Each structure stands twice: as C-alpha cells, then as structure tokens.
Amino acid sequence: MEVSGGDTCRPRHPQGLREGPEPKVAAAAAAFRGSANRCWNLSVDTSNRLSDVFNSMMLTGSAPFYDCYKSQNEDNVDLRQTCTPLSSSTEYASSIDSSLFYAPWSTYGDDIKQPPSSQISVKNRIQTERNDYGSETDLYGLVSNILEEQDKSQPYFAEGTCSSNLKSVWPMNTSRFVDHHDLLTEPKRPVDTSISQQAFYSGESVSAVEKQYLHNSSLTPQQKIDELYHGYTGLDLEEQWLYLSRSDHSNCYNSQANDTVKATFQEYPFVKNCFTPQTGLSDIMKESGIDTYAYGREKICTKGLETPLQHKRAEIFLSQFNRYNENADYCRYPEYAHPNKAKLNKCSNFSVQDGKKLANGTPETPTVEADAYTKLFQVKPANQKKMEETIPDQQNFAFPKTTPHLTEKQFAKEAAFTADFGLKSEYGLKPHTACPTNNDFANVSEKQQFAKPDPLNSEYFKSVNLFSNSATSSGGISLNRPTWMNVQTKNNLPIPYRNQGNLMKLNSHLSAASKGSNHSSDFPQLSSTNLTSNSNLFQKYCQENPSAFSSFDFSYNGAERIQSVNHMEGLTKTGEDNLFESVTEKKIKQPNGFCDSYSASQYGIIENVNKHNFQAKPQSGHYDPEDIPKHFDGLPQNTYQDLLESQGHFNSHRQGSGDNNINSRVNRTQASCFSNNYMMGDLRHNQGFQQLGSNGFPLRSTHPFGHSVVPLLDSYDLFSYDDLSHLYPYFNDMMYGDNSFSGFVPTFGFQRPIKTRSGPASELHIRLEECYEQWRALEKERKKTELALAKNYPGKKVSSTNNTPIPRLTSNPSRVDRLIVDELREQARVVTLLGKMERLRSSPLHANISTALDRHLESIHIVQSRRKDEIVNASNRQRQGVPRCQDDRDVFALATAIKEMCVATRKARTTLWCALQMTLPKTASTAGQADMEKAFQDLVNCEEKVHESINSSNPMNQRGETSKH
C-alpha cells in the first residue's frame, strides 16, 4: 500500500532524496520487535511463506504499520498479523534475530547469541532517548527499527529492478551470513548450528519445516560443505535448474528394443555423456569375412567393397544412426520430458523407432504425432537382429513401437522413399543413384578418402542411400498422410564427378512443389542463384591450383571434407525441400569408412547458428530457379569437396517461434581446415543465399547429439579470446567483431566465445551488481545531504572530507577490490558528515545511527577478509592441485559476504536520511528545497558527463574489467 497524498504528519524533505523507508508512528515498535525477532531469522522457505502472507495482507487492505515507511519496491506490510500464526510454532520460538546482536567480524569464533537481558537494556535505552527527543516521533520509529530491518525478498537495486540478463541461482532472502556457519573456517565455527543448507540445493520435495530442520549433528564439516554446493556444478547464467524430477528419468530412457537389456543412466543425463563406445563393430566385420586393415587412429577400413556386403554396411551404419539419433537431448527441456507417453504434446520432440521390415522389404513408418514438427523412420534390414544380439548397447535408447500410417501400396509408388543397398533395383533405380527425399538425412553418399587421396582407387566414391523421412505437420494437417508427401522425382540435373577420367553420375532430383499443404504458399522459394560470380571465380581458382586445397588434412585423414550428396542437393532444392531442411536442421556426413568407431555426430551433425551465414528474407520474395549451374566437370575431387563445404557446410540455422529470433547460442562447429567458409570467406554473404523456415516451429536444443568427442580444430582453440588481448589490443575486434555492432561481420568471421560461469561465480556477479547499485545510491544521497545542509545552514562549512586512511588498489584490481575501496571511502565520508550534523544540531544523534554505520564498516571488513582468503587459497590450490570444489566454496563465501554488505549499505542510506531529517531546521521552506534540488541535479548531471567521457575514452579497460569479479 502506498502513502496517501493527504498525509501531513511526516516532515518535509526533498523529493527523491530517500527512496527507502519513512515511518509515521512508532508506538507499536516494541510490540512489533517482540514477534519480529522470532520471525525474521527464518531461512529460505519460511521467508517465502512470509512474503506470501505479506502480499495477501496488502491485497486485503489492512491497516499499515508503516504508512510513510516505503520500501524500495513501494510496498508496505502489516507485520502485526503476519507474525501471529508463525510464532505459535515451538521450533521457531528459540530463534533470535542475530542481526540485533551483531558481533564484530573479528570475533566470529565466539558465541554470537547473547542473553535476552541485553535486548531489554537496548529497548530501555531507546525508550529513554525517545522521551528526550519526543518531538520527532516518526523519525524515532524509523531509527529504532533500523537495526531490525527485515530481510525481505526484494531486490536491493536502487531502482527496485534487476537487470534482465542476471539470474540468481539461490533466493535473495536466504539467511544471514552468520547463519552460514559452514562457510567459516574450522576454528571459527559455532558449536550450535541449527540450520542445514540442504534445503537450498536439494531437488527433492520436502516441506518447509523439514527443510529448515534437517540438520544432523553427526555430519562432518566436509559433508556440510558438500550440501552447500550440491546442484552448483553444472549451472551457468543460461541454463539453470533444467533437470527433471528423478521419476522422469526412467520414463524418458527405457530400453525397449531388447526386453532383457536395461541400461543404467546418470542422474542428470544431459550433463554427462551417455554415449558408449562401439565395441562389437570389429567382431561383426570378422564374422562377415571382410579383410580389414588399420586406417588412421581407432578406425577400421575394408580392403574391398563387394556388392553383397553393402547390406552389412547399411546395417552397421543404421545401427549407429539409430543409436545416436535416439540419444538426443530429450531431457533438457520440460516439454520434451515424456516422449513415450500416450498423450499428444504440441511441443513434443520427434519419436524415433526401430523400423520394421514388411514382407517385400518396404520399411514401416511411425504414426504422426499431432503438431510434431519432425518424424523419422529408419530402414532397418531384417538381419540386423544379429547386430542387436552382438551389440545390445547400441539399442539401449529405443522408444515404443507404434502402428504404421502409410500403407505398403502407397509406399511402393514412391521412388524417393525406397532404400537401395546395391542388392537389387526394386523400383527402377540404379545401385549408385542418390535419391533425394524431403530431408537432410537422405542421400548420404559414402566416399572413401585416405590420408592422401589415392587417385588409382577405382572405388573412390561409393554411394549408400540411407533413407529416413522427416515429415512436417502444421496445426491444420491431420494425422493421416499429408498430400505433400506425394513426391515426384525427376532425373533432371546430372552432376558428373570426375574420378581419374571415369565419370560416375549421381542424379540429383528436384522435388515438385507441394499442393496439398495449407502452408505450401507461405514460404518463398529458395534462391537458386547460389553460385554466381564469386563462386565461379573460386571454381576457376580451384581448377588452376588443385594442389592448394588438397593438402590441408591436418592428420584427420580427410574426414572433415567427407560430404554427402545432399550438400549439392541443398544448392538446387526449391521451396518445399528447403523448408524441410530448415525444419530438420541437421546435416549428416557418413563417417570415413563404414566401420568407423566414432559416432555419426562427430562428422555429420553440423548445426551452426551463425549470424554471419544467415540473412532474414521476407516471405513475399521469390527467385527464378533457372540459373542453377549444370556442370562442374573441371573440378578436381578435393577441390569439389572444398566447394561443397564452402557452399553447403555451414548453412543450418534456427528460427524462433513467432518472431524469427535466431538462437544466440554458439555451437561448436567442425573447422574444415582452410577449405571452409570461415577461412576462405563466405561465398554466400551477398548472394542472397537464404534458408527458409516457418514461424510455427518451436525452438529446440542446439545440441541434440551432444558435443563431438573428437579433438577437432575450433576457433576457440585456434585463437583464444583473452590470450592476445594484451599484446594486440584490436586483435579481438578484428577476429571476433564488436559486440555493440552485432549485424557487422568480423574480419575473419569467428564467433566471439560466450563465457560460462559456475553457480557460485554467477551468484558473485549478481551480488556485486546489487551492492554497486546500493553504493552508487549512497554516494548520491550523501552529496544531496551535503547540499541540503549547506543550503539550510548558510555560513557553516559542511563537507565530508576526512583524513581516514583508505587502502590503495592493487596493480590489477578486480571488481571486488574496487567495491571494497569504494565502500570504505564512502563509509568514512558518511561518518564524517554525521559528525558535522551532530555539531549543527548541538545534540547527539540516535544511538542506532552510529550502530548501523559500525555494522556497515564491519561488513566491509568481512568482505575484505573473504577476498584475502580467496586469493590465498587459490594460490595454494594452484600449487597443490586441490579440486575446484574448494575454490567454489571461497567464491560462495565471498558472494554471501557481499550480500550482507549490500544490506548494510542500504541501512546506511536509511540512517543518513534519518539524520538529515533530525538535523534540518523546522523552518525550511519549500522554495529552498526546490533550489537545492535543482543545484543537486546540475551537480549529478555534471558528474555523469565526466564519467561518460572517462569510460568512452578507455573502452579496452572496460572490456577487460568485465572478465574479472
């Protein structure tokens, strides 16, 4: 409840001088404190319960205790009613507000709880001073409660709001620092700690009372520390508390392909890598009689590829594909939490199944889910049962089987959905024909490429057509087979590959435009002028210098340049096919050799959310698909692969739901040495090469298959963001671009890395921001107070200048060091100014004012001590190799101390305002206050201009400062 405008009891003061508390009466202060002492010391959940009661009291309109005492978020609370139901609990009765008996920071080893008699003496002293200075009743009501100011769950920012990009990983209304006894050193811990911090970080549902009093006296100090940091290990600013309840893990990951096999999973599966190595591939090859020889590191290749063996090849690769496809990141987001439940979920992820083989070899497809934007089916040969028996761990992420929705007759009519493994041409297709479907998983052309390509190898290119359909269903499409799945293929774009004089044509097909989908006209056609002057020049250069691009293997055996035919198909696809490409957003290159021991995601999952490779295109635009180049005869093999990578390797993007927001998460992409568009320049920047996407597709995880475990070259590894910043000041801007101009492309096209922080580090930065806000507000209010006193006491020198020694900053200070020095300086100035006020009013100020300032100084000393401990312990651990958990404990202790300093700074602001109201003469006119406000505003504006000029003149220091805490 806000203060009514007709209130005339409060003293006049400048507008905006104090945004904090202003009391009206203090008659009930003693009655309030008796119950408040039992309530304000509660920890997290109890405080949350209190805040809920507070909100209900405000809505019911009960009589306020503080009519003029406005908190920073302009709320007022009736505390007389809220404390009644909670104080009846016997377990809360023994809890005493530790802030009332604040012990010096140097004596934390002693028991800080004092007998209740001291509380009575403090009340008697306050009552005596109230009788002496009874003319200012409202001020004494405020001053009397300064030391007992509640620790509400409200932000301590000066404006009452917190920055949107700052997320706290633990509540703002946690118990005080003196309650965190586990953070203190061993000899300084009190014996009777009564609150366990397990409730802060445990993900289990326990009642509030049980959370508060789960303390076990038999726990060792190290176990208590582990409780404090449970849940902090995998947190950062972007992903917090994304774990599911433990009951969902067994539902999400059930091994149903083999009823006798049950897999064991991590408690939080998306943090840990659940992939298991393929241990049985070599055994399968030995059983099939294939001669093998060593190929690179941890790879096996065959000496010859016979046509009957292609069935085995497809079987092994499909088992790879099924396994890692089913191991997608389902548990990262709550809407994907129950993939095998029967109810339809609009945001549910695609359901992966084991494809059954019908009588004539036609694969069976899963049922379409309502509004599911991707569905997959895999062609699984009948003899893969042997593969399942040999390698059961590859099928440990299977999902339940569903009924087919496409009939055998319908399927047989479409050549695009058939699988040709070289056994026979059932539907009139050649064994080496790449048949495009509506997705990017099809047309995977396997090519064998050695460390130095052997031009004499007649089987340089072998194609294995792996077909898996990715269907898109919008809101209006029924569960039956949509009409846009009737694809007509045309053999109208032959692209010859030159292989030592022998040409093997892989026919690329253009799918006909959709007519049945209700969204078929909503998406513009893809620009077909992908290869224009720049790309033609690149081709010419590649023809003239074939050796310039064929030697950049970097000991990866050419695996980075293995591309599938769908990259060339991606250059020629029109509207609908590229719509599906933007839906599936996955590119798969088959691993080098069909018996690769790595996962398919290591070489093929390319999801580059790169703002430099994506340009938004209005939906009304259309392009003429007649300008596609027909032939690439003159390109050598390696050069052709490089061109494919340059044109189609990094063109995947993501679009948000509704507003076309591109996901800003940076993905690790495979650096294809110097052949990709990062090092050679993107040929599509000004060529109108756009990806198309729908506004209706929800945003998915950017890492569906996890990070690659192969140590591929990356821009993070090639050029570190901080390594060269001191030697070359403009190196980072040239390599990564400037964050302030996100639309401009950096010189070398590298994406600026995003630094992630742990939970305690994130909390430290949040508390720093809060405390800086309070410090700035205290500084402004101190200057405003000086102006008010100078205006109302002409001829008197009012200044906060003092000779108090302030420690100097180190040569390379962090933000914590700067904050400590600033707080010490401001606290000394406030103390000096309060001494001037006492001389001006010829009487001492309230005792709580000086006590609050003393506690402010103590909180600063605590932060200083925690900072020293962090530095010393970090240096010791660096020499001894202690685990990082100890480092996190120091950071957490520092963040807690800064939080307490923030509270003390806010109370110092309250005391400063109270002292000013007690000091100002009662004859101060409104006109004089207006003049003072104007003068103060001019002073503040002048100082802000000076700060802006200083900050703009030294941008590099600002950038370097953000990397520290």
Swiss-Prot record:
Tissue expression as described in the entry: Expressed specifically in fetal ovary and postnatal and adult testes (at protein level). In adult testis expressed in spermatocytes, beginning in preleptotene and extending through most stages of meiotic prophase I, including leptotene, zygotene, and pachytene.
Any one of the GO BP annotations: male meiosis I
Protein location: Cytoplasm; Nucleus
Region (Disordered): 1-22, 946-965
Keywords in alphabetical order: Cytoplasm, Meiosis, Nucleus
InterPro entries: MEIOC
Gene Ontology CC terms: cytoplasm; nucleus
Deletion phenotype: Normal growth but mice are fully infertile with barely detectable ovaries and testes at adulthood. Complete absence of follicles in the ovaries and spermatozoon in the seminiferous tubules and epidymides. In testis, approximately 60% of the tubules contain spermatocytes arrested early in meiosis prophase I, the rest contains only spermatogonia. Testes completely lack postmeiotic germ cells, and are depleted for meiotic germ cells. In some individuals, germ cells does not progress past preleptotene, while in others, germ cells advanced to the zygotene stage of meiotic prophase.
Residue ranges with Polar residues bias: 949-965
Described function: Is required for meiosis completion in both male and female germ cells. Confers stability to numerous meiotic mRNAs in gonads allowing proper initiation and progression into meiosis prophase I. The function may involve YTHDC2 and is independent of induction by retinoic acid (RA). Maintains an extended meiotic prophase I by properly promoting the transition from a mitotic to a meiotic cell cycle program by binding transcripts through its interaction with YTHDC2 that regulate the mitotic cell cycle.
Assembly and interaction partners: Interacts with YTHDC2; binds transcripts that regulate the mitotic cell cycle inhibiting progression into metaphase, thereby allowing meiotic prophase to proceed normally. Interacts with RBM46.
Protein name: Meiosis-specific coiled-coil domain-containing protein MEIOC
Organism: Mus musculus
Organism taxonomic ancestry: Eukaryota, Metazoa, Chordata, Craniata, Vertebrata
